[in-house]
Amino acid sequence: MRGKQPKRNKDNASVKRNYRCVGYPDCNMSFNRTEHLARHIRKHTGEKPFQCNICLKFFSRIDNLRQHQSSVHSDVDLMSLRRLQQSANSTANDPNATRMFPQLRPYGIVVQPAPVPYNLPISTPASPQDTISLYAPPYFPHPMPSAPIPLPHQPPPLPIYSYMQPLFLNHTPIQNHNIVELPPDSSDTPASPSKVQSFDQAKDASPNAKK
């Protein structure tokens, strides 16, 4: 059976309260511990250092914050949320991190991507000279001559039609289009010029041959 505890002496209790609230004439309260005095001073200053990491609401006392989280945000897994917040803080401190955490947005925690260390050139249609000027010149340990180096002379390219031109284009065109050639004789000798007649003469001679 539990024994009776001795009654607290009011005189001894008042003596042990060594931490008194000063700076506020209307307040004469004293406390046994420094954290109790600090918590009391927040009532005068209106300071609320404890913030809810879910709804971002501030509280002056840690016990009020815990009570708020257990009653209002009872369906939220606080341990998982703390791990996500620690991972987000470590990622935000990493300069190479560019990831976002969409699962933290409902809780007011957003990780911004790291800025790009340099500006990339915009790919726009430009001449080769403009494209080369976007980049830094190459580094050479020895001084380069300022005058341009002459390139070896190259012959001009051949025209495309030089090897596609037909042979008959090199000859003069025939002016009389009515000239026909008679069939050759039984011998394989080439036809003589006398056997070549005009188309009009052959037409006139055809009725005489029938007579």
UniProtKB/Swiss-Prot annotation:
A zinc finger (C2H2-type) spans 19-44, 50-73. Its main location: nucleus. The keyword Zinc-finger applies. Residues 183-194 have a biased composition (Low complexity). Residues 178-211 are annotated as: Disordered. InterPro entries: VerF-like, Znf_C2H2_sf, Znf_C2H2_type. Keywords: DNA-binding, Metal-binding, Nucleus, Repeat, Repressor, Transcription, Transcription regulation, Zinc, Zinc-finger. GO terms for molecular function: DNA-binding transcription factor activity, RNA polymerase II-specific; RNA polymerase II cis-regulatory region sequence-specific DNA binding; zinc ion binding. The keyword Transcription applies. This is Probable transcription repressor protein RGM1. The lineage of its organism: Eukaryota, Fungi, Dikarya, Ascomycota, Saccharomycotina. The gene is RGM1.
